[in-house]
Structures are given as C-alpha cells and as structure tokens.
Amino acid sequence: MATMETTTQKDTNILKSGLKKTIGVLNEAVLQNGREVEAVQAGNSDTMEDTETTTIGYISIKDYAYADSNPLHYGYFDGDNEEDEMVSDSSNGEDTYNKRQSITLPDDYIVNQRAVALYDFEPENDNELRLAEGDIVFISYKHGQGWLVAENESGSKTGLVPEEFVSYIQPEDGENEVENKARPFYLTHLITQSVSPKNNIDNTNEDEYDDNDEWEDIDDVAEVEADMKTKLDISD
C-alpha cells in the first residue's frame, strides 16, 4: 500500500513538472509573438509616415499637348524639388526632340531620278506600287534590301518597287522623251485657232487694206509733183 502511494506521488510530481515546462514554453511563445507583432506595427507606422512625407507637396498634372500614350502626358509638381523636376523635364524634352528630328539619309541612298519599268509588278502589300512594263516612275531614294521608293508619273501614288524591275533613265534620254510628248490640249487649241480660215480671211483683208493705203500715198505724191511743176512753170 505504501509503495502504491509513493508511485502515485511520483507520477503526480512528474505531471506537475511537465505542465510547468509546457506552460513556460507557451508563455515564451506568447511573448515572442507579442514582440514580433509590435515590430511589425512599428514598421508599418514608419512606412506610413514615410509615405505621408513623400506625398506631401506633390501635385499630379497632365499635359494635353501630348497623347495619353506619351509619357510626357502625365507628370507631377513638387515644390521642394522644383529644380530637380526642371532638370528632369529638360532631359525628357531633349529626348523627345531627338526622337522628332528628321532622319538624314546617306548620299548613296538618295536617287531623285526617273526610271522605266522593265517588267510588270503586282503589289502584295499596301505600301507597294503597281508597275506595268514601260511605265515611267520617279525614284526618290533607296528603301533598302532591294526596294526603291517610287512615285507614279501622275504623282498620285507613292510606294515601294523592286530595284531589279526598273531601269534608270539618263538625263539626255529624259529630255528627248519630253520633246516627243504630245502637246497639252490648250496649246493645240491655240494653234488650231491661229490657222483657221476665218483668221486667214481677216488677215487677207487687212493686207489688202494696207496695200491700198500704200498705193494711195504714191498717187498723192505724184499729184503734188505735177501741181508744183505747173505752178513753177519750169521750162527747159
């Protein structure tokens, strides 16, 4: 009986010591969690303070001179960092200016010469120009990779044509071709009017009138001479 009581007492003591250890571990865990929560809260408060500090004095602006897709459309104004903002704006302006500058082509890319189509060409894309054999086109410059930027003879359309499909016209050939071109309609009309029968009749009448005036002048001179001889009574 005494042995059983001793064993029960030992078990009780073991349970008590185990509970104390468990409670101690739980208390430490609770304290540790409390410290972590305080640290997180402190960090959040610092972040919020920094955010409030960084957003104070900033005014969001929009520049409607630029499209919505352009980065220059949106911006902000900071009273404390106005100089930095001006420097940033100037750099952005320079970048934009450089992007807007015209691209200068190398001299060997510029053609500015007329050409004649050697073969028919059917365009496969909207930026290509249709050619028929014998068409005259004006080549502005080389587009690259065997393509030329051409304009049709009427000047109504511009597009790309294959370089091997055309042959350049030399200046002297171009001059001869210009001379052999048909006259404009208004020149033909003027020439036709100038040689019409009505004009010929009018010109003939005017010529006859001028001839009569000349003969009348000669007769008048003869009469004056005869009158002078009579009055002077010149004798041999």
Curated annotation (Swiss-Prot):
Under InterPro entries, the record lists:
SH3-like_dom_sf, SH3_domain
Q: For this UniProt record, give its keywords in alphabetical order, as a comma-separated list.
A: Cytoplasm, Phosphoprotein, SH3 domain
On this chain, the residues bearing Phosphoserine are 102, 196, 235
Cellular compartments per GO CC: cytoplasm; nucleus
User: Where is the SH3 domain positioned along the sequence?
Assistant: 110-171
A GO biological-process term = fungal-type cell wall organization or biogenesis
Q: Which domain of life is it from?
A: Eukaryota
List the subcellular locations.
Cytoplasm
Which SMART domains does this chain map to?
SH3
User: In the record, what terms sit under GO molecular function?
Assistant: protein-macromolecule adaptor activity
Oxidoreductase in keyword set: no
Could you confirm whether the keyword Phosphoprotein appears in this record?
A: yes
Note one Pfam family from the annotation: SH3_1
Q: Extra notes?
A: Present with 521 molecules/cell in log phase SD medium.
Q: How does it assemble?
A: Interacts with PBS2 and PTC1.
Q: What role is this protein assigned? A: Negatively regulates the high-osmolarity glycerol (HOG) pathway through its negative regulation of the HOG1 kinase activity. Mediates the binding between the PTC1 phosphatase and the PBS2 MAP/ERK kinase (MEK). With PTC1, regulates endoplasmic reticulum inheritance through the cell wall integrity (CWI) MAPK pathway by modulating the MAPK, SLT2.
The name of this protein is NAP1-binding protein 2
| Organism classification | Eukaryota, Fungi, Dikarya, Ascomycota, Saccharomycotina
